């Protein structure tokens, strides 16, 4: 809010009309502007024009040169909801068990767009939105889990502060669990891996927490979070594990279908 007020003050100063200057030598005492007298061929016909009158030929108004108010400042000025309030409102819909899935997915889409802003992502902590967001990773609906993982990945991408917060909130084990869980929806796995990739890069504590969880899956070697090739190796391994699980489920399904068809053929 303070930032918006400062921006509003700056805008008002830039767009204010300067007061008339006091009369001085060479100025018209009534309006404080220098007068230029022009003479036509008729010696009795003279006209006086302010020297600082705006040009009619440059085609650019003074207002166009002034800075504009961004939507957030306009919302604050006219009483609209702030982005922080929109984030809280979206989370209320996401955690409302009476809300329809369609409305919750719309709220998730809006929430994800809001936290693309670094300031809004950082506000997840003071707004106490981390806990409910991570809680949605365990939602019954796969699409809700997918969107929750997507939002986590967006919030921590290239942001040391939110990476640390995710670690403190216990989000790393949850994401590793989603990325490695047998039978998990493919789209959910992919977004969980995306979130892990964003969470561990250049954040050694998060990388250590992730590899500690992955040790149960045979991938617990120490990895330098600043070595992008090494981090990519872990992420690619996770993707490979996901594909292996998907292929395993598909094979099991194909075998089952084949068995059923053979039984039908035998009559």
Curated annotation (Swiss-Prot):
Keyword set, alphabetical order: Cytoplasm, Repeat, Translation regulation
Pfam families noted in UniProt: Fes1
Localization annotation: Cytoplasm
GO molecular function, one term: adenyl-nucleotide exchange factor activity
Gene3D superfamilies with a match to the protein in the record: Leucine-rich Repeat Variant
Residues covered by region (Disordered): 17-63
Ranges of biased composition (kind: Polar residues): 54-63
ARM repeats: 58-99, 118-157, 160-201
Any one GO cellular component localisation term in the record: endoplasmic reticulum
Ranges of biased composition (kind: Low complexity): 23-49
GO terms under biological process: regulation of translation
Homology family: Belongs to the FES1 family.
Summary of the function given for this chain in its UniProt record: Functions as a nucleotide exchange factor (NEF) for Hsp70 chaperones which accelerates the release of ADP. Required for fully efficient Hsp70-mediated folding of proteins.
Name of protein: Hsp70 nucleotide exchange factor FES1
Classification lineage: Eukaryota, Fungi, Dikarya, Ascomycota, Pezizomycotina
Annotated gene: FES1
């Amino acid at each position: 809010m303070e930032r918006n007020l400062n921006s509003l003050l700056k805008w008002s100063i830039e767009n204010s009309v300067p007061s008339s200057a006091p009369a001085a030598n060479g100025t018209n005492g009534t309006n404080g502007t220098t007068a230029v007298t022009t003479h036509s061929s008729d010696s009795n016909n003279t006209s006086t024009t302010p020297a600082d009158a705006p040009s009619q030929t440059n085609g650019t108004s003074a207002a166009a040169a002034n800075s504009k108010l961004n939507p957030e400042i306009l919302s604050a000025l006219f009483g609209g909801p702030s982005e922080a309030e929109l984030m809280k409102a979206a989370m209320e819909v996401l955690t409302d068990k009476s809300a329809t899935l369609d409305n919750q997915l719309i709220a998730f889409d809006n929430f994800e767009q809001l936290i693309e802003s670094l300031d809004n992502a950082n506000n997840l902590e003071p707004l106490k939105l981390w806990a409910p967001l991570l809680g949605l990773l365990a939602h019954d609906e796969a699409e809700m889990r997918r969107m929750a993982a997507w939002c986590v990945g967006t919030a921590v991408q290239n942001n040391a502060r939110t990476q640390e917060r995710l670690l403190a909130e216990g989000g790393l084990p949850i994401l590793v669990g989603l990325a490695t869980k047998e039978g998990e929806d493919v789209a959910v796995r992919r977004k969980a891996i995306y979130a892990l990739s964003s969470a561990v890069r250049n954040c050694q504590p998060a990388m250590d927490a992730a590899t500690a969880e992955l040790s149960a899956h045979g991938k617990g070697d120490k990895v330098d979070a600043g070595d992008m090739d090494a981090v990519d190796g872990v992420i690619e391994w996770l993707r490979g594990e996901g594909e292996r699980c998907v292929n395993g489920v598909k094979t099991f399904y194909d075998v089952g279908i084949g068995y059923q068809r053979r039984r039908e053929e035998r009559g």
